[in-house]
Amino acid sequence: MVQAEKYVVMGGAGMLGRAIVRQLVERGHTVRVLDLVQPVEAFCETIIGDIRDPRAVEEACRGMDVVIQTAAAVWNVRTPRALYEQVNVDGNRLVIDTCLRLHVPRLVYTSSMDVVVDGRMPIVDGDESLPYPARMPPDAYSRSKIIAEKMMLAADSPALCTCVLRPVGMYGPHDKYHLGNVIGMARKGVSLRLGNGTARFSHAFSENVAHAHVLAAQKLAPGAVVCGQAYFICDHYPAENLFDFMEPFLRALDLPIPRRSIPYRLAYALAAFAEIVAPFSNFNRFAVIQTCVDHTFVDGKARRDLGYSPIVSREEAFLRSVQWLRSPQSM
């Protein structure tokens, strides 16, 4: 039986954070949430605050056994570039410093597969041996996540055991970005594919990624193999083209299936133009490359060190996601 502990989940009102909170509460742990908004579910104590705010972070971390840090400025058209640095770099630096000052012994950080994507070369069955890009990627989000991940790994010590999880393309209930972007465009009548449909992409359901975070938190201890390590987290089914992955969701919602496609080279040229006329848009060359070039990963290291295996099947993940997409919350 797992001993009950005290956890704070930063970003606990988000897609991943909600799933982590739910799993921790089900295991009998005491859970606190730090987020900009109040979670709909009244699972636990909530502190409304920002990870850039020293007082809010201190209040959240005080007396905790574990910090699970999922909060981030995510890749979105409305996110100012400066915010990535402020939240993903400065905010995480504050979290590390606060954990050390308050003697919080364990810290799990949610990174991203994007930290190894260089924007030029395809990745097929990538693992943790992949280096960071020799040149920083062109988008502010990926740059900030690389810096934050390096900070988190460097912070590992007997006083603060840290590890980093790198989810691949994550989806599930309350997904406003991965599923949300494609479904949102389809609801507005935009039905286009990018590329020739051969590029493959790895995915992970939010509950499975949450399970990996809980496992990582339990494994952290001075001298443990997981300390100072990064792990890719995937679902265990073959990678597929992004638009092929999205098609069953569109069908379930009676939305149009994209049949027209923009060739890769044309999409790349249009994205380069968009970077000039709409620099805050998510339609940029990096986004086109990620969609039109293979980005697949494996998680053998997480299986070995964390004992990770998905707890929700693809079929069940689809049903849960569609149920949420049909709800008023997703509109």
Language model regions located:
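Active-site Tyr-X1-5-Lys
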Residues: M136-C163
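Conserved Rossmann-fold NAD(P)-dependent oxidoreductase catalytic core, especially the SDR/UDP-sugar
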Residues: L94-Y141
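N-terminal Rossmann NAD(P)H-binding glycine-rich loop of SDR-like oxidoreductase domains
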Residues: Y7-R27
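Conserved C-terminal active-site "lid" loop/helix of NAD(P)H-dependent oxidoreductases
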Residues: S206, A230, L270-S309
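Substrate-positioning beta->alpha
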Residues: R143, I147-A148, D175-N181, G195-K219, ...
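NAD(P)H-binding glycine-rich loop region in Rossmannoid oxidoreductase-like domains
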Residues: V40, G49-D90, T98, D118
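Mid/C-terminal beta-alpha module of Rossmann-like enzyme folds, strongest
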Residues: K219-N282, F318-V322, M331
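Amphipathic terminal alpha-helices
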Residues: K6, D299-R304, S309-M331
